[in-house]
């Protein structure tokens, strides 16, 4: 089975590894995003999928086109894929590509929920009790094609973005292999477009928080752990946040307790414990040390 794989981040790399490791599958090409400037020095960083292929010296050609027009359409045709697999690629496939071979997208939600760029973030932010993933036959609309298969699990503990992404990626790898190997016998299911919800691309401003609702702040700390993290108006980052309770009413940002575990901060609804704080341009500090440096005490306001 000849597969062209289209994917970019670490989530997609987990899936690519599973395909490469399967004896029935030959990955005949990787399409991924272009290398991008990263960090303060703006050094070019390759997508994780590309890095995986290069570091393991795999004989898989890598393509990083700016768009999927000619000559890329002809390149895809020449690779003669049985399937084109798309996992967090970051580009919309034009009709000319969709007609080359069945295009199967692995999407990290139980479609039609959370179509779009940030489904895992949305599952966390909405405090979902069930996490899931779907394989879908792609069409010209965004994440609207027929559902092929899906898998899910019941949440037992809160998971941050990295942990949930990894768990869903491994679940998704098994699901995708099942879809590819059983494609001809799978009964496709049309999506109920009336039930669809959409999620946007995450931006830096999404990390801005205040001390209004403890549960919401805690969920944002999980969803935005890797980037953009969560921060106050003055840029102070709140690191390692724990939800303590979500009922009592306090002044916004009121310091309730200070100990070695962190600072207990009140919200209009609930309270959170924050283990570390990081001022703009500074290294992270234990919350207790940061507060001492700012001469903030119990009863003061963290803002």
From Swiss-Prot:
GO molecular function: methionyl-tRNA formyltransferase activity
Pfam families assigned: Formyl_trans_C, Formyl_trans_N
Gene3D superfamilies assigned to the protein according to its UniProt record, in alphabetical order: 3.40.50.12230
CC terms in the record's Gene Ontology section: cytosol
Catalyzed reactions: L-methionyl-tRNA(fMet) + (6R)-10-formyltetrahydrofolate = N-formyl-L-methionyl-tRNA(fMet) + (6S)-5,6,7,8-tetrahydrofolate + H(+)
Record-linked InterPro entries: Fmt, Formyl_trans_C, Formyl_transf_N, Formyl_transf_N_sf, Formyl_transferase-like_C_sf, Met-tRNA-FMT_C, Met-tRNA-FMT_N
GO biological process: conversion of methionyl-tRNA to N-formyl-methionyl-tRNA
Binding site for (6S)-5,6,7,8-tetrahydrofolate: 109-112
Keyword Protein biosynthesis listed: yes
UniProt keyword annotations, A-Z: Protein biosynthesis, Transferase
EC annotation from Swiss-Prot or TrEMBL: 2.1.2.9
Keyword Protein biosynthesis among record annotations: yes
Record PANTHER family: METHIONYL-TRNA FORMYLTRANSFERASE, METHIONYL-TRNA FORMYLTRANSFERASE, MITOCHONDRIAL
Family of the protein in this entry: Belongs to the Fmt family.
Task performed by this protein: Attaches a formyl group to the free amino group of methionyl-tRNA(fMet). The formyl group appears to play a dual role in the initiator identity of N-formylmethionyl-tRNA by promoting its recognition by IF2 and preventing the misappropriation of this tRNA by the elongation apparatus.
Protein name per Swiss-Prot or TrEMBL: Methionyl-tRNA formyltransferase
Gene: fmt
């Amino acid at each position: 089975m000849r597969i062209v794989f289209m994917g970019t981040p670490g989530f997609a790399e987990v899936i690519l590894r599973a395909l490469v490791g399967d004896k029935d599958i030959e990955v005949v090409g990787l399409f991924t995003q272009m290398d991008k400037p990263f960090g303060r020095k703006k050094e070019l960083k390759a997508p994780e999928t590309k890095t995986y292929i290069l570091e393991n010296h795999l004989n898989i050609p890598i393509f990083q086109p700016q768009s999927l027009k000619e000559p890329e359409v002809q390149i895809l045709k020449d690779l003669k894929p049985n399937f084109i697999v798309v996992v967090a690629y970051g580009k919309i496939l034009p009709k000319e590509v969709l007609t080359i071979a069945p295009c199967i997208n692995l999407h990290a939600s139980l479609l039609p929920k959370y179509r779009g760029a940030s489904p895992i973030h949305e599952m966390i932010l909405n405090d979902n009790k069930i996490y899931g993933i779907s394989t879908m036959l792609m069409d010209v609309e965004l994440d609207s094609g027929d559902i092929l298969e899906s898998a899910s699990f019941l949440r037992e503990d809160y998971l941050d973005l990295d942990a949930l992404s990894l768990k869903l990626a491994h679940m998704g790898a098994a699901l995708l292999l099942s879809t590819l190997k059983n494609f001809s016998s799978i009964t496709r299911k049309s999506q109920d477009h009336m039930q669809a919800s959409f999620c946007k691309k995450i931006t830096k401003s999404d990390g801005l928080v205040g001390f209004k609702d403890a549960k919401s702040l805690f969920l944002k700390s999980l969803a935005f752990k890797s980037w953009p993290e969560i921060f106050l108006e003055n840029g102070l980052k709140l690191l390692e946040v724990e939800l303590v309770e979500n009922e009592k009413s306090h002044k916004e940002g009121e310091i309730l307790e200070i100990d070695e575990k962190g600072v207990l901060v009140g919200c209009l609804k609930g309270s959170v414990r924050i283990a570390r704080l990081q001022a703009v341009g500074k290294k992270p500090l234990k919350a207790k040390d940061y507060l001492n440096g700012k001469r903030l005490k119990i009863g003061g306001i963290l803002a």
